[in-house]
Amino acid sequence: MESMLDRPEQELVLVVDDTPDNLLLMRELLEEQYRVRTAGSGPAGLRAAVEEPRPDLILLDVNMPGMDGYEVCRRLKADPLTRDIPLMFLTARADRDDEQQGLALGAVDYLGKPVSPPIVLARVRTHLQLKANADFLRDKSEYLELEVRRRTRQLQQLQDAVIEALATLGDLRDNPRSRHLPRIERYVRLLAEHLAAQRAFADELTPEAVDLLSKSALLHDIGKVAVPDRVLLNPGQLDAADTALLQGHTRAGRDALASAERRLGQPSGFLRFARQIAYSHHERWDGRGFPEGLAGERIPLAARIVALADRYDELTSRHAYRPPLAHAEAVLLIQAGAGSEFDPRLVEAFVAVADAFAEVARRYADSAEALDVEMQRLEQAVAESIELTAPPA
């Protein structure tokens, strides 16, 4: 769309009239102050109206053979390129009904013939000024809209970067080379988008909610920053005290995110999802999970979705203490958990998108380097545990 800054200083007026003398008269009257373009028929006027640069104002004779001024006006107002150009009718008709018809079609003024030069110049100047004001407001509005979009994109990019940084803090405790987080984000999106197409979930899983849920899933283990390495990385059986420490990561994550939500001072869909997920993604459908032993739909939907995605990732990822399961085996195990570990409806959705899960697992598989790092960290954790449990000399 043409900006006011791109326009020449002198406005362009298009005059459409089938009488050459009238065209000459209007040109002589206007050309000292404006650029003037003329057309001798309705069709010629339509062509002239879309030529670049487009006119700022159109003076249009009503009584023309073939295509009269009213029809020209209708077509101009129907064309997105010309509908906002102000149009003034010129006519020898003095009938009030004719004037009402012209104004109803979108004309801004109605001038009688023979024209009065001072009145024509005054009306032309008035309508050009009105158009300039309208264009200024439109351009300013467009600029502000573009600026808001730009700022929104910047804030979104900043938010995404902060989310990734925070999520990585938690993931670093397990394995800094793992691609667990990119996989989880994509698994959650696949499940949520499939569920969103079902009536039972459509209200809760709007497109915006799916985006927020996918991103907030990255923070599911943020509370692990509060768990000692010797507990977090211990491949063996934990005692009761260490089990409590490990399970405490759900409360630590929830409390940190709840604190952020309070400091924000207003509701945040992202933080709400993140808090629910961090606290409840280890709950089970049958109520045998932790930290609260919630069952069924008392477990937030976001947490139920992440629980299934996280379980699939655990089963199909390479670990230092065990090889990954094949995709088909993982699918069977998750199906077996329907009604006990997982919401049965989510398991149905998972089966429907299982091939896409397999593709994500393949594309974002951990490298051999990630496995080496995990092995080193496990060895360090075991050594630390031995030191802590060794009897004093």
Swiss-Prot record:
Residues that coordinate or bind a divalent metal cation 1: H180, H220, D221
EC number: 3.1.4.-
Post-translational modification: Phosphorylated.
Subunit structure: Homodimer.
Domain Response regulatory span(s) in chain numbering: 12-128
Activity regulation comment: Phosphodiesterase activity is activated by phosphorylation of the N-terminal regulatory domain. Phosphorylation triggers a conformational change of the HD-GYP domain, which renders the active site accessible.
Domain called HD-GYP: residue spans: 155-366
Domain notes: Contains an unselective bimetallic binding site, with a high-affinity site (H-site) and a low-affinity site (L-site). Metal binding to the H-site triggers the binding to the L-site. This bimetallic center may play a structural more than a catalytic role.
Keyword list, A-Z: c-di-GMP, Hydrolase, Metal-binding, Phosphoprotein
Disrupted-gene phenotype: Disruption mutant has increased levels of cyclic di-GMP. Mutation leads to reduction in both swarming and twitching motility, to an increase in pyoverdine production, and a reduction in virulence. It produces a biofilm with little heterogeneity.
Annotated InterPro entries: CheY-like_superfamily, Cyclic_di-GMP/3'3'-cGAMP_PDE, HD/PDEase_dom, HD_GYP_dom, Sig_transdc_resp-reg_receiver
Function: Phosphodiesterase (PDE) that catalyzes the hydrolysis of cyclic diguanylate (c-di-GMP) to GMP. Hydrolyzes c-di-GMP to GMP in a two-step reaction, via the linear intermediate 5'-phosphoguanylyl(3'->5')guanosine (pGpG). In vitro, can use pGpG as an alternative substrate and hydrolyze it into GMP. Acts in regulation of motility, synthesis of virulence determinants and biofilm architecture. May act preferentially as a pGpG binding protein.
GO biological process, alphabetically ordered: phosphorelay signal transduction system; positive regulation of cell motility; regulation of single-species biofilm formation on inanimate substrate
Location of 4-aspartylphosphate modifications: D61
GO MF, any single term: cyclic-guanylate-specific phosphodiesterase activity
Enzyme class label: hydrolase
Name this protein carries in UniProt: Cyclic di-GMP phosphodiesterase PA4781
Catalytic activity annotation: 3',3'-c-di-GMP + 2 H2O = 2 GMP + 2 H(+)
Origin species: Pseudomonas aeruginosa (strain ATCC 15692 / DSM 22644 / CIP 104116 / JCM 14847 / LMG 12228 / 1C / PRS 101 / PAO1)
